[in-house]
Structure formats: structure tokens, C-alpha cells
Amino acid sequence: MNEQVRSILVQETTKTSKIQQLFLLGVPRAEIARMVTNGNYGFVVNALRRMREREGGLNIHPATAALDYTFNRKFGIEIEAYNCSRERLARELREPGIEIMVEGYNHTTRPHWKLVTDGSLNGNDTFELVSPILVGEAGLRELEKVCWVLDLFDVKVNESCGLHVHIDAAGFSMEIWRNLALSYKHLEAVIDKFMPVSRRDNYYCKGLGHVSDEMIRSARTVDELKSRIGNRYHKVNLEAYSRHKTVEFRQHSGTTNFTKMRNWVLFLHKLVTFATREQVPAATALQDIPFLDSEQKLYYKQRTKKLSA
């Protein structure tokens, strides 16, 4: 296949023709964008759409079939905050039916929400609120109930607080792990712009810029990839896999706002879903992120504007 790819790339023909030939050969769209359009994923998508319209639809093989972004994935969330004692917050959360316990600092997954201590936080009555395993839209509805209580009792966040999201990674192949790490690395500059400055490269959520694409692509095991990225204090934490069979995303700023949480959880879900097929090309702009719909692109465009003001 490599020889066929090379022969297509050297043809004296249009980019559109090369894109269509490579697609029919089974080359992933992100790779086509890298090879033909200098990473312009949108150009590739448009070229293939025109081809489908002209030919009345393509018989697309499984490797390039449309991805299903329905949100039914397992996930977990950790909310760092302050300004309410753990005992009081637990009482108030039980009222709307949230099962919760006050515990000492631990990393054990529970079947209930837990309120634990966290020595990295600043403020009065600091705490970390950790969810049990949540699933899809039902999990988001439970999270929304929790956020109502946090808002009602004036729970606050500051720059020492973060929002950590765990996404189920059981069964990931090494191709998915590599695609995921590369995609986040390639989108890091875009993501940084819709995060506060305090979450762009602090000690507890360091970036991936120190890891070259080749170091990621050549990793043969999760442990090897984990050692190349570094310890758990990175925007993408692979250490969570050995303990919880999850991948942890640590970059989001502390918040009690459900809209922010929901959008970030869905962003990560779609990022992971996309990584099951391919990687996001380097230097992809926000408007060209292939897994976001127009509503989410608008949301993050507005977040970017607000944080740049």
C-alpha cells in the first residue's frame, strides 16, 4: 500500500483527485490531510463530500464509516472547590437523593460520591468531590443535580482548583492510545485558548509539548507511552489506566458550572471516539476540529473570546 500511496502523491493532478484516490485506498482522512493539504482537514472533508454527491453516495468500507458519537460512555469527575464544610455539603447532597460519604484522602473508586481532602487546594473548607462511575446522559443528569447543590450553597473555586475528568479506557488498543495522545497534543494550543492562563501549563497539569510525535508513534505499550509523557500531573494522565482503567484529563479549571462541565465531558468523549479511528492533524484550528458539531464550536469560540478579553 505504501507504494500505491507514493504513486498517487507524485501524480501531476489536482489535490482533490489525490484525496479521492487515497480515500478509496483506505487511507484515514487525517493522514490524507497531512500528506496532501498540509493538515487542512476541512478541505479533505469537503472534497469527499463533493465526491459522494457526484457519485450518489459511496460504498464506504468499515474503516471509514461514519463514527457514532452517541454519549453512552462511562466517565467520572473530580470537582475541587472550597467554602463549604464536607459534612454540611454531604448532608445537603443527600437531600435530592445523591448517595455520598465523607472520607479521608484515597484513590479508591466507590459506588457512591465521596468528599475527600486535598492538600493542594487553597481557601477555607477545601474539598474534592469525586463521583462514582457515571454513564452517558444519565450520568450527566446526576452531575447536574450535584451542581445545583454546589450553586445553592455558594461553593467557590479559585486558581488552585481543577476539574478532572476520567474516561473509560478499558479495551483501548495501542493505536487508540497513540491517536489520543497525538490528537490532544495537536489540539493543545487550541484548548489552551479556551482555558484560563492558570490551567495552560501549571505543575498539576503540564503540557505534552515535550513529547515529540515520533516518541508517541513509536510507543509499543501503554507503560512505554506513559513513561514518555511523564507522571500523573499532565493534561493527559495515563497513570490512571493502571489504577482505574481510565484516562484522566486534568486541564479544565475548577468550576461548579454544569454547562462548562457538560461541554468538556462531551468534548473529551468525542475526542476519544475520534481516536478510535484516527488522529487529529497537527495545527488544526478550532473551526476545523473534525469531531465537534457547530454548537460546540460556537461555545468554545465564545469561551476563547471571553478568556482573551
For each predicted feature, which ranges?
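C-terminal accessory/tail domains of diverse enzymes
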Residues: 30-31, 42, 49-156, 170-309
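A general structural motif at alpha-helix termini
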Residues: 36-37, 48
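Short, amphipathic alpha-helical "recognition" segments used to contact nucleic acids or chromatin
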Residues: 10-27
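Eukaryotic N-terminal low-complexity, Ser/Thr- and Lys/Arg-rich leader segments
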Residues: 8-11, 41
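Short, charged amphipathic recognition helices of the HTH superfamily
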Residues: 25-35, 161-164
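Helix-turn-helix DNA-binding helix
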Residues: 19, 41-45
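Short, Lys/Arg-enriched N-terminal segment that forms or immediately precedes the first helix
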Residues: 1-8
